[in-house]
Swiss-Prot record:
The SH2 domain, residue ranges: 422-530
Organism placement in taxonomy: Eukaryota, Metazoa, Chordata, Craniata, Vertebrata
Gene name of this polypeptide: Lcp2
This protein's record includes keyword Cytoplasm: yes
Function of the molecule: Adapter protein primarily involved in signaling pathways within T-cells, as well as other immune cells such as platelets, mast cells, and natural killer (NK) cells. Plays a crucial role for transducing signal from the T-cell receptor (TCR) after antigen recognition leading to T-cell activation. Mechanistically, once phosphorylated by the kinase ZAP70, mediates interactions with the guanine-nucleotide exchange factor VAV1, the adapter protein NCK and the kinase ITK.
Cited CDD domains: SAM_SLP76, SH2_BLNK_SLP-76
SUPFAM superfamilies (UniProt xref): SAM/Pointed domain, SH2 domain
Residue stretches of biased makeup (Pro residues): 186-201, 400-411
Stored InterPro entries: Immunoreceptor_sig_adapters, SAM, SAM/pointed_sf, SH2, SH2_dom_sf
Protein name per Swiss-Prot or TrEMBL: Lymphocyte cytosolic protein 2
Length: 533
């Protein structure tokens, strides 16, 4: 649609829903007319159509209506250049625009509105001409009368009177006061022309009044700045000696405001550093105690602390394997000595170990050295608890292990007691997995030496479950001389020996956690031993 046939944006903004409906009736958009009346869409709303508003019109008309709305907005933009300038003399338009010739300029109005006369409905033409005669005539005349306002400068001077205050300055600078004040301070004005120019747009009426005060104050400020610069080096010189920390407390008093924060901050840093080593030092003494313990235990055994713990055990275990029922004497003494920690872990040993404690309280002193006697547990179960107090009280076999093997071959110590169907001493992880997969049943397990082979991580328990091999560390705690299974984060179950761990989880399910998938939780008992394969 040509812009000549499109009404101006200013007109459409003033339309109500009835005027917009009449316009659509004029364009033969009966369906749009109904939508406008139904939803009460006025001209301003039509020019700023939203997605919700345009959906209210028929779908076939939506492209045409959006194009029409754009054309109306563009039609006003072309005339906006002329309408901006006459906004100031609008007060004069009411008095002068009607006095000017309407004959020549009415032809321009006809030129702009003649396309509207071509519309089929004559009634609508009257509707469009009536606002043009009253409102649009003023805008068009003002737009086209740009030369006449230049001729009517005498009439417009009343509205431009505020800028006449510039003549009072009698100088090229707008912000300058009378010449008398300027002459008093000739050197200062050239220094301050740039900062004085910005206040001009804020208010020209007050421009001659506001600058004189800063002009009088500026020299005083500049003088103050010069005087302030003189003590400034004295302050810097005074701050130089306090940089020495030895003189800092003496210099703090004259410079309380500016100097206390830096000195107060600096000592705070070393104080924090002094506290840091204090926090780190406490763990060091226990480490020294550990070395002292190792040195004290050195003459007894040359290996790590878990090994001397087995120093007495291997003798008894070898004897137990040869003749379990013939040597019951050393067996009851060991569980009875370590019963302080054992009852909290397993049910069977705890029920039988609690009895000797009441009868033999003094046996705990020897239990700290050797208490990992897993192979001796089956004979305990075969024997009654009543046999233990007399056997322990006799104490015949207690000194035997110490003189016979005070320092036996340490590797053989742990191999012989653990050399059962589920223990393999030196084997790699792939070989151990192959041994487990030979049986290939859930609950297949074995115990092998850890690749680290340290005092804290001596063994590894490998379990096959659902075609996946789980490696669980068997840790040794030197302080309490007990074995722990896993990381100990999920719970703390300590055992006197590795055999106790195997015996316990043969009856109780073992929690298996996948390192890659922490959400998986499986439980199984140790059923099939793969150590002899």
């Amino acid at each position: 649609m040509a812009l000549k046939n499109v009404p101006f944006r200013s007109e459409v903004l003033a339309w109500n829903s009835d005027n917009l409906a009449d316009y659509f009736r004029k364009l033969n958009y009966r369906d749009c007319e109904k939508a406008v009346k139904k939803y009460h869409i006025d001209g301003a709303r039509f020019l700023n159509l939203t997605e919700n508003d345009i959906q209210k019109f028929p779908k076939l008309r939506m492209p045409l209506l959006s194009k029409l709305s754009q054309d109306i907005n563009k039609n006003e933009e072309r005339r906006s250049i002329f309408t901006r300038k006459p906004q100031i003399p609008r007060f004069l338009e009411e008095t002068e625009s009607h006095e000017e010739d309407d004959g020549g300029w009415s032809s321009f109005e006809d030129d702009y509105e003649s396309p509207n006369d071509d519309d089929p409905d004559g009634e609508d033409d009257g509707d469009y001409e009536s606002p043009n005669e009253e409102e649009q005539a003023l805008v068009d005349d003002a737009a086209d009368y740009e030369p006449p306002p230049s001729n009517n400068e005498e009439a417009l001077q009343s509205s431009i009177l505020p800028p006449n205050s510039f003549h009072n300055t009698n100088s090229m600078y707008i912000d300058r006061p009378p010449t008398g004040k300027v002459s008093q301070q000739p050197p200062v004005p050239p220094l301050r022309p740039k900062p004085a120019l910005p206040p001009l747009p804020t208010g020209r009426n007050h421009s001659p009044l506001s600058p004189p005060h800063p002009n009088h104050e500026e020299p005083s400020r500049s003088g103050n700045n010069k005087t302030a610069k003189l003590p400034a080096p004295s302050i810097d010189r005074s701050t130089k000696p306090p940089l020495d920390r030895s003189l800092a407390p003496l210099d703090r008093e004259p410079f309380i405001l500016g100097k206390k924060p830096p000195f107060s901050d600096k000592p705070s840093a070393p104080l924090g550093r002094e506290h840091l080593p204090k926090i780190q030092k406490p763990p060091l003494p226990p480490a020294m105690d550990r070395h002292e313990r190792n040195e004290r235990l050195g003459p007894v055994t040359t290996r790590k602390p878990p090994v001397p713990r087995h120093g007495r055990g291997p003798d008894r275990r070898e004897n137990d394997e040869d003749d379990v029922h013939q040597r019951p004497l050393p067996q009851p003494s060991l569980p009875s000595m370590s019963s302080n920690t054992f009852p909290s872990r397993s049910v069977q040993p705890s029920s039988k170990n609690t009895f000797p404690l009441a009868h033999m309280p003094g046996a705990f002193s020897e239990s700290n050295i050797g208490f990992q006697q897993s192979a001796s547990l089956p004979p305990y179960f075969s024997q009654g608890p009543g046999n233990r107090p007399p056997l322990r009280s006799e104490g015949r076999n207690l000194p035997l292990p110490v003189p016979n093997r005070p320092q036996p071959p340490s590797p053989g110590e742990e191999e012989t007691p653990l050399d059962e169907e589920w223990y393999v001493s030196y084997i790699t992880r792939p070989e151990a997995e192959a041994a487990l997969r030979k049986i290939n049943q859930d609950g297949t397990f074995l115990v092998r030496d850890s690749s680290k082979k340290t005092a804290n991580n001596p063994y590894v328990l490998m379990v096959l479950y659902k075609d996946k091999v789980y490696n669980i560390q068997i840790r040794y705690q030197e302080e309490s001389q007990v074995y722990l299974l896993g990381t100990g984060l999920r719970g703390k179950e300590d055992f006197l020996s590795v055999s106790d761990i195997i015996d316990y989880f043969r009856k109780m399910p073992l929690l298996l956690i996948d390192g890659k998938n922490r959400g998986s939780r499986y439980q199984c008992t140790l059923t099939h031993a793969a150590g002899c394969l």
